[in-house]
């Protein structure tokens, strides 16, 4: 008989991957880099009214004589958009004196780090074996595994 090939993922869906500390850190760094490279822009649909709802119109009746000319600030914001890295280079902070974004840092903490649950925020004595997140109860572990474990949360 010929053995049927199966996918590695479909063998045991209940089995969780266990990552070591270095793999967890690489994963977090990769996710943070993806967030940094993400092209943030204002919501293009923010000014549009929602369908099916009538929104009240607020007009200034006192200033009916003169109409104010609308500024083209949004046009320049969109046309000359810069990312965070470009703004830092433009400020030339590496040669500036005094504390700035590149040179400011806090001293080491005087007390050890307190572990808090990633789900509810209470003190947590347990750690997830897959991703290293903290949890306090079995209920929080279940919520973590269903919604957060090895997903895009930092």
UniProtKB/Swiss-Prot annotation:
Renumbered to this chain, the Basic and acidic residues biased-composition regions fall at 14-23
One Gene Ontology term, aspect cellular component: nucleosome
Keyword Chloroplast part of the UniProt annotation: no
Report the residues modified as Phosphothreonine: 103
- A Gene Ontology BP annotation from the UniProt entry: regulation of DNA-templated transcription
Q: How is it modified after translation?
A: Phosphorylated on Thr by MAPK11 or MAPK14. Phosphorylation is required for MYOG induction, for deposition of histone H2AZ1 at the MYOG promoter and for SRCAP complex integrity.
Keywords in alphabetical order, please: Chromatin regulator, Coiled coil, Metal-binding, Nucleus, Phosphoprotein, Zinc, Zinc-finger
Q: Where does Zn(2+) 1 bind?
A: 117, 120, 136, 140
| Annotated segments matching region Interaction with NR1D2 | 72-110
Location of the protein in the cell: Nucleus
Q: State the superkingdom.
A: Eukaryota
Could you confirm whether the keyword Oxidoreductase appears in this record? no
Motif Nuclear localization signal positions after renumbering to this chain: 38-47
What is this protein's function per UniProt?
A: Plays a role in chromatin remodeling by promoting the incorporation of histone variant H2AZ1/H2A.Z into the genome to regulate gene expression. Promotes SRCAP complex-mediated deposition of histone variant H2AZ1 to lymphoid fate regulator genes, enhancing lymphoid lineage commitment. Recruited to the promoter of the transcriptional activator MYOG at the early stages of muscle differentiation where it mediates binding of histone H2AZ1 to chromatin and induces muscle-specific gene expression.
Question: PANTHER family, alphabetically?
Answer: ZINC FINGER HIT DOMAIN CONTAINING PROTEIN 1
Name this polypeptide is given: Zinc finger HIT domain-containing protein 1
Its lineage reads: Eukaryota, Metazoa, Chordata, Craniata, Vertebrata
